[in-house]
Amino acid sequence: MTTKLKQRFVPQLAAVNHEFEDDFSKMLETVDTSHIKPGTVVKGQVVDINEVVVVDVGLKNEGRIPKSEFLLSPAHKLPEIGDLVDVYIEKTEGHSGKTLSREKAIKEELWGQLELICSKGEFVDGTIFGRVKGGFTVDLSGVVAFLPGSQVDVRPIKDPSSIMNIRQPFKILSMDKKLGNIVVSRRAILEESRSEARDEMLSKIKEGMILEGTVKNITDYGAFIDLGSVDGLLHLTDISWARVNHPSEVLEFNQKVKVMVIKFNEETKRISLGMKQLDYNPWEKIKEEFPVGKKMTGKVTNFADYGVFIELKDGLEGLVHSSEISWLKSNQNPRKTLTIGQEVEFMVLEVDTEKHRVSLSIKQCQQNPLIKFAETNPVGTVIKAPIRNITDFGIFVALSDNLDGMIHEGDITWEDNGNELLKTYKKGDEVECKVLTINIEKEQISLGIKQLTPNPYQGIADEYKKGTVVKAVVTAIKDDGLEVLVNDKAAGFIKKSDLSDEKEEQKPEMFAVDQEIEAKVASIEKSTNKILLSIKAYKIAERQKALKEYGSSDNTTNMGDILANALEDSKK
């Protein structure tokens, strides 16, 4: 229990320093208390401490101040009975006498000093002692200021406790006396000192220097390294001689790293850093270790859309392109046939020391099944094979488990109805066919069914030369012309425009099936071996022949008679 101080306190302004006198009663009678007004700071004496701190400033009633106003920060302590303290007068009258404030007294005392410091741009010492929403509280020797989270440091702080309860400088950003708010910055101090250190470091930095730094930020293309007062970029390709898909595979935030300055731009002040440059370059003797044509084994390390990566040795990989995985399935998905960690045999195809690339092949270590097939089934060989697949343009037959041959629709029959015959085949049917071509480079085998029988149109070009007059029978009437059979053995066709030399008679419907006609050979269609005929050319030739033969015998004979006679002779 505390003992209340009985002797009354002689009031005085906070700026005045009087000593107590023995005759306290006499002094009280002569003391002028007119200076004690609301809004002033005066000295008072602590006369009691219980739930509150009781302070006597020399008036009729003593003031009661909450203990919390004496404990604004961890550095502050409660006063003891008898101590003199500065207090702020809020009221001088009331039911409980005057109202005092220790907190306002402290602020009033320090505010002027802080305003002067702020106007000069000087720094003020303080201590971070608490966390609040959006930042921290800072004790500026009794005045509490706000430190926003964005003003704590130049980079995010992982452990805020490391900067708390430490006396350190701050810069005052703003002051509002009416609201009693002060905003400070720790970052501004760091940036200023960092700027000076940055200029000093940039003046000394040289390419080839080896420095230590901290990973400040990680991006898809690399990592930014804090070198103390400046940052440098460690590009993805300069992290390791081995393939790195993302910097986070090797680096982590706040990690300490040793780097080399590989490039410094004097104008932009940009610093490019490298880690791999501190290690042995495996590409220096790569061609000696992995000569082209050498067969080796290695483990599958990673897949890509365009192939698979295989480990050559620690930190070094080679690429097997999708087209080099199998002889039979070009550009196949490597995930369907290989697994991570699988040991595979490969051959070195190419080594590019400039681009740091090694091209490998898995299929080159295996016998090409097309070569094996060609050895046992040369062109002209007749084979039997089951149909594996049917498409719009032909048939694929299975020559082995992983080898197919193709029969194009044009190689199914000598006639021009291969597309129709294609529909009569079904998957699994065994077909007999002949090997037509084997293209090792393109990895293609062409087969044919029609080649099993002689070409019925062989020699047609010799027999039916252009201009030859032939007899034919109409076999079908089409919108675009007539299909005919020439000399009872060869297929022919007469286009609509070749049906007559008269425009109004160029109509297929004017003819009938089985009708016999005479026409001239216009050409041979090589793709179908079909003979293209022309009635128009035949009639024009006959007319010219008649004119030549009968036209000069009698000038009085009319043209109609000449043609009639010529046609009559041609029918004999």
Swiss-Prot record:
It holds the Pfam family S1. Residues 39-103, 121-187, 208-276, 293-363, 380-450, 467-536 form the S1 motif domain. One of its GO terms (molecular function) is mRNA binding. GO terms for cellular component: cytosolic small ribosomal subunit. SUPFAM superfamilies: Nucleic acid-binding proteins (SSF50249). Keywords: Repeat, Ribonucleoprotein, Ribosomal protein, RNA-binding. Gene3D superfamilies: Nucleic acid-binding proteins (2.40.50.140). GO terms for biological process: translation. InterPro entries: NA-bd_OB-fold, Ribos_protein_bS1-like, Ribosomal_bS1, Ribosomal_protein_S1-like, S1_domain. Belongs to the bacterial ribosomal protein bS1 family. Binds mRNA; thus facilitating recognition of the initiation point. It is needed to translate mRNA with a short Shine-Dalgarno (SD) purine-rich sequence. This is Small ribosomal subunit protein bS1. It comes from Rickettsia bellii (strain RML369-C).
